[in-house]
Each structure stands twice: as structure tokens, then as C-alpha cells.
């Protein structure tokens, strides 16, 4: 049974989060009564308010008002006053993934999972389905530039969603098609062990119904191992691996564009198909890999090669995925969400491939627990940056862990062999270093899932101020 419209007012706690805001927006657009709260104002909050949704800043019991259902983001703890009030009122309390699952019951659904690349891959699948005139509903973990939002209604039969594995609730999503881009050591604070992470992704794939299929990246050893354990579902593999069903090859970089070919071999029919001279307006092999996952689905759903080619060429990207925020004296400045060592390594490799000069990475480590679990991996992921600037850790509500701070990370990266790693404290430090050290052709790349994005947005202006010999300041 689909969710009835007479369930009453739905209250979203933590509605400003990227996943929650998209779900709230879609429920509002479907005609449900929606309100919410968040601990801080944000662009997502303002976007929802612009649609007429009432949102309170700060978490207080009275925010619930006449709510009949309460939806919690994964970040909300049981000590939250709105959670406590909902329990006292005996209201239904629903996790974010459960509400997303309710939306998925309305459509045929594609769920994109993996420890990295989910947001970009989700956006690319949406772009190719758009190009094929499928007009999908989309709920993503990032702002899709073509839409200006992370949620889109769509009037077609298909829905594309990002499947967040961080708390295990992605196993509740009823997907007809499941994508797994990669499986790395992540969210160990929730799962407890990497074996539990592996098992969760196996279950994610096996949850696909017999009439659906999974799309798995054969370039990743853990995903290839997963593919070998799936014997009762239809699996399509992709990557550079010669054994993959859908291979991408002949890559060449041209600034912020990548040219490549795709070769498709159907295990069912034996038919072979070539898509040559594809152009993706993004740099990096990791982005071509994500695009190939999208191509696999589009091809299987019968979208023409011409539409696939057009959809890729016109792909507008995702906010905070190697997004250029400005330039100064020939120095290009970028903002990226990458915060796991695998993501950081991929972004810096792409920057190295396309930059004419040096690569300067400004990194804000995200969560003490992640740094603790992946300390050695962080030491080895910056090799493609000529200079690494480590900012204070963005704790995201976590308490510091002794011996695993920004200063210790700087020393650990140096011990691993990097020649130029520096500790910084504020944006003024970045302005000073870039203005005196960087040269035309260099890339300055901000990396992190926290508020370092504000630095990336502010840096071009702060550098421009120097040209006028004025003092600069940062709020």
C-alpha cells in the first residue's frame, strides 16, 4: 500500500541536510503537509522556505506543533528534544531512508550505492534518462547543477536515488536496479568492522528483485569479489577491466573535458556495441568510471547511443564536485566534497592530469573517527599535490581523539615522504600562501565535507582585494 495523503503533518528533524531536504521537497511537491527544523540556517533551508515550507532554526520540543509523523536525519541523536517529545507523544518516528523508501514505491527505482562516487553517478544516470526522455524523479546527495536542486519531481515511471550506506538503512530501499561503484573502509564507527560493510553491500545487491539487475564496478577488488558471490541475480559489470561487460577505454584529457570510448558486450545476447568519441565535461578517470555506470543503465533501458552521447556531452555536473569557484592571475580555484582518502586521491590525480602548473591542496579533515580509522591512508593520499595545507579538523559533533589531530596528520604525511605539508589555521593563511607562492597555471583545490566550502567561495574575492592593496577579512 502506498502512503496515504491523510497521515497529517510530517515534521523533518534535521531538514537542512542534503538528503533530508530533497525528501522533504518531494513530499511537499506531492501534496503532503511538511514542516521541519534544523540546528542552523543554510541554503537548503532557504530553498525549502522559498517553497512555502515552515522551518524552525534550533531544536525544541515545541517545534513539533501539530505534527503527526516525525522523520529523523541520521545525524539526530536520541537526546534531541524533538525526538524526546515525539516519543512522549507516541508519534511514529521514521528514519530518513524509510521515507525515501516510501517515495520509491511510487516508481521503478534505481539506487546508487558505493563508498564514493554516488552523487555524481546518480546525477549522470538522471542526465542520461533525461536525454532519453524518461523524465525521472531524482533525489540526490548533492545539488545537480542542471536542476539547481538535489530533488526533482519528474513525471516518468523511473526514479533515481542516492543510497547512503553510512548507517545501514540503505538496505531498506526497494530498488529495481542497484549500482555499486566501490567498497572501501568507511563508516567503521557504525559498522564496527570492514566485514560488516562488505556484508551490507552484498545484501544491498541481493535485495534487487529477480526482474531487476545490479551494476557493479569490476575495477574495484572488493566489488569484483562481491560480484563473485552473487549467483541468483542478473549482474552487469563495468570498468577498464578486460572482463567487464561494459568497458571504457582510450581516455584523453583536454582541460576540464575527457574523451573516451565505451565497448559493450552483452552476456545475454552476445551482441557487441561500440560508443566512440564520447565527451564528458569533467576531468578524471573516476568520473569516466561513474559515467560508464550510467551508460550501462541507459543502454539496458533502451536509450539510444545518440541520446547517451548527447546526455554526457551536456552534463552540467554537481555542486562541490571539482567545482571552479574562481580564478586569480591565472590561478584556478576549485571546491570539492572529497573527504575520504580514496576520494582525495582521485580528485588530486584528476587535478594533476589537467593542471598546467602545480597542484595546491587545502584539506579540512572531516570527523575525528574517520581520521582515527584511516590515519595511514590519509598519509598516502596526497602524492599528486605539490603542496598540502591541513586545516583544523571539522568534528561534525564528535569529540577530539588524542593523537589524531591536524598537527599529527601533518607530521604523519611528512613521515610518509611528502615534501611540502603545512599546518594552517584560517583562510588568511591560505591567502598569504597562495598570493606569494602560486603561479599562473596552478590549481588550488579545497577538499572536505565541512565548512571549508566557505573558504573556497571566499578565496577568489580575498585574492582580488590584494590587487587593490586593501585589507582582507573573513567572517
UniProtKB/Swiss-Prot annotation:
Pathway: Cell wall biogenesis; peptidoglycan biosynthesis. InterPro entries: Mur-like_cat_sf (IPR036565), Mur_ligase_C (IPR004101), Mur_ligase_C_dom_sf (IPR036615), Mur_ligase_cen (IPR013221), Mur_ligase_N (IPR000713), MurCDEF_pg_biosynth (IPR050061), UDP-N-AcMur_Ala_ligase_MurC (IPR005758). One of its GO terms (biological process) is peptidoglycan biosynthetic process. It holds the Pfam family Mur_ligase_M. Its EC number is 6.3.2.8. The keyword Nucleotide-binding applies. HAMAP family: MurC (MF_00046). Cell wall formation. This is UDP-N-acetylmuramate--L-alanine ligase. It comes from Bartonella quintana (strain Toulouse). The lineage of its organism: Bacteria, Pseudomonadati, Pseudomonadota, Alphaproteobacteria, Hyphomicrobiales. The gene is murC.
